[in-house]
């Protein structure tokens, strides 16, 4: 079998690795694979669309692949530079480089008959073709910048997309900076702007609200005393959901919509407890409207550094807030006199370069209009990316048409889309690893059986929403593990010792857990759990962390009991040990 992989980012590299390794785990002949990457090095967006001081918002423990870990176990979040270094090491560790063709642009993918495909590529002006049996599209979500249509955009002296941002120097001297977009990159750039001595003002524009979620469990003060066991090293949020009740033993009637809704209620309650607002973490302004508080709009922004500068003018000073904060309060930075103005989306920019904003009744809109007319000197478009597959013919489906776990379309498993789902809290690379495990087994006819119809891992989709590929990270990873029989049961985990069973039950949904059993079982998985991952359960949870986790577990356990199935119902758990 011959397989082409398009794209040399994390999803492409992990796809290449599993294709090359398949014959070591399954009784099949070696697969011939070529990976085509248009740039001159691997890493994808992390190599070419990142910036100074950029840091991943998903933890190193979650983001790194199951069988190759970051060398420094004390690091929770990798910089973009470190992550590219990690991916380079991944290539070396598994001997991927001989199968990677860099600086090679895929021009066309077409069918040749009998289920095969022809890849046309160009390299240094030379065009060539390669015929294969299957194609893995791993070109990623962040390639073609999305440029909004705003009349008069060219009347701002400096305008560029966030994909071009590299350093705070680009924001200029004594400038009024405007950032369009409230995703992680937009918030990062706003933070760099407001804390730079060179800029005069910073304004962030949003379309219709956003939700801030911390990437670490917040450090808190209880009656004025910091409760964290390790100040500055609070547990990453994406490691904090216990696998036992989040996935393994949650009744089918509680899974999906109800489970996600209840979890979000708990998050909102926790946010109020430590910051005084339910809109988001320390988010006193810019919230989503009530009719938009559904999962299709509810992708957290996990860059929190800018929010204190946005919230400063809006924080409550009521006696209730003062009383609450005197008892328990998240540790927040002192912003001094610096602030970030929040504004509605620009409607147009007039001949004088003055921005005219869309009119609404939001508090931030009223404050901005009262203060001044705004004339930006620098405008950064942190407006995301659009999906584009110019190399695919019309006979091929697109990721949104891939109805089998977002990987392939029914009846056409020879074309797989890896890494095109977006988790609300989580990371794309580990989900790509789980997706490719399923896809490769299907290619070689080694899937245990047909995929069970199950959409409980999907975030609700709103017909008017822009994002249609959202998933709950933990539930999706677990579903993929169930598909291939790699979700370990209690007794299968217990067979590896008490450390493994503790992490299996109370640790996060990390892919190494799914290498204990199943078609991709790996003997090194228990060692990684013991040496690295167990610490996320036993080493860094404060008193408040444990109390909150205990409440959630009691609630989830109660949900299981109250939803106990009738006799003969075999789906309380899908783990078969």
Curated annotation (Swiss-Prot):
Output the Gene Ontology terms for molecular function: flavin adenine dinucleotide binding; N,N-dimethylaniline monooxygenase activity; NADP binding
Q: Where are the disulfide bridges?
A: none
Which EC class does it fall in? Answer: oxidoreductase
State the pathway, as annotated in the record.
Answer: Secondary metabolite biosynthesis
Query: According to its UniProt record, which cofactors does this protein need?
Result: FAD
Asked whether the keyword Flavoprotein is assigned, the reply is yes
- Give a Pfam family name: FMO-like
Entry's EC annotation? 1.-.-.-
Q: Which UniProt keywords apply?
A: FAD, Flavoprotein, Monooxygenase, NADP, Oxidoreductase
- Function of the molecule: Monooxygenase; part of the gene cluster that mediates the biosynthesis of the indole diterpenes penitrems. The geranylgeranyl diphosphate (GGPP) synthase penG catalyzes the first step in penitrem biosynthesis via conversion of farnesyl pyrophosphate and isopentyl pyrophosphate into geranylgeranyl pyrophosphate (GGPP). Condensation of indole-3-glycerol phosphate with GGPP by the prenyl transferase penC then forms 3-geranylgeranylindole (3-GGI).
Task: Report the family membership.
Answer: Belongs to the FMO family.
Q: What is this protein called?
A: Monooxygenase PC-14
Gene source species: Penicillium crustosum (Blue mold fungus)
């Amino acid at each position: 079998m011959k397989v082409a992989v398009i794209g040399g980012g994390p999803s492409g590299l992990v796809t290449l690795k599993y294709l090359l390794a398949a014959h070591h785990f399954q009784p099949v002949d070696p697969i011939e694979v070529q990976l085509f990457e248009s740039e001159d090095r691997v890493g994808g967006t992390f190599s070419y669309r990142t910036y100074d001081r950029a840091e991943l918002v998903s933890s190193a423990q979650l983001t790194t692949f199951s069988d190759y870990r970051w060398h420094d176990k004390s690091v929770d979040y990798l910089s973009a530079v470190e992550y590219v270094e990690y991916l380079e090491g991944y290539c070396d560790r598994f001997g991927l480089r001989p199968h990677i063709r860099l600086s090679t642009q895929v021009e066309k993918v077409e069918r040749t008959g009998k289920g095969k495909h022809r890849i046309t590529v160009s390299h240094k002006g030379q065009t060539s073709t390669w015929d294969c049996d299957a194609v893995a599209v791993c070109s990623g979500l962040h390639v073609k910048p999305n440029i909004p249509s705003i009349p008069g955009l060219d009347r701002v002296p400096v305008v560029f997309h966030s994909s071009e941002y590299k350093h705070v120097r680009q924001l200029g001297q004594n400038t009024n900076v405007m950032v369009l977009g409230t995703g992680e990159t937009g918030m990062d750039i706003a933070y760099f702007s407001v804390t730079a001595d060179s800029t005069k003002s910073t304004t962030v524009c949003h379309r219709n609200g956003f939700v801030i979620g911390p990437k670490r469990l917040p450090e808190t003060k209880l009656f004025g005393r910091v409760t964290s066991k390790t100040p500055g090293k609070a547990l990453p949020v994406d490691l904090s959901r216990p696998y036992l009740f989040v996935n393994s033993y949650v009744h089918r009637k509680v899974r999906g919509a109800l489970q996600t809704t209840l979890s979000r209620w708990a998050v909102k309650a926790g946010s109020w407890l430590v910051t005084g607002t339910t809109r988001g973490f320390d988010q006193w302004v810019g919230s989503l409207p009530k009719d938009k508080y559904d999962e299709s709009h509810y992708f957290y922004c996990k860059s929190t550094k800018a929010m204190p500068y946005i919230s400063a003018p809006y924080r409550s000073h009521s006696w209730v807030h003062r009383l609450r904060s005197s008892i328990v309060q998240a540790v927040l930075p002192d912003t001094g006199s610096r602030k970030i103005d929040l504004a509605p989306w620009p409607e147009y920019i007039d001949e004088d370069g003055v921005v005219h904003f869309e009119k609404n009744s939001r508090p931030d809109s009223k404050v901005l209009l009262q203060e001044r007319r705004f004339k930006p000197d620098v405008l950064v478009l942190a407006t995301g990316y659009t999906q584009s597959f110019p190399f695919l013919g019309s006979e091929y489906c697109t990721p949104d048409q891939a109805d089998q776990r977002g990987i392939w379309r029914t009846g056409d498993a020879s074309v797989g889309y890896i890494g095109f789902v977006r988790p609300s809290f989580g990371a794309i690379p580990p989900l790509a690893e789980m997706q490719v495990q399923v896809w490769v087994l299907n290619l070689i006819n080694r899937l245990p059986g047909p995929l069970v119809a199950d959409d409980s891992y999907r975030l609700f989709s709103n017909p008017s929403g822009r994002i249609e590929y959202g998933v709950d990270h933990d539930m999706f990873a677990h579903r993929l593990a169930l598909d291939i029989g790699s979700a370990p049961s209690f007794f299968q985990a217990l067979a590896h010792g008490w450390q493994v069973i503790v992490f299996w039950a109370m640790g996060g949904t990390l892919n190494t857990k799914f290498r204990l059993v199943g078609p991709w079982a790996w003997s090194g998985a228990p060692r990684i759990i013991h040496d690295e991952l167990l610490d996320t359960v036993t080493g860094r949870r404060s008193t408040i962390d444990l109390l909150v986790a205990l409440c959630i577990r009691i609630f989830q356990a109660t949900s299981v009991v109250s939803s106990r199935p009738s006799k003969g119902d075999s789906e309380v758990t899908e783990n078969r040990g």
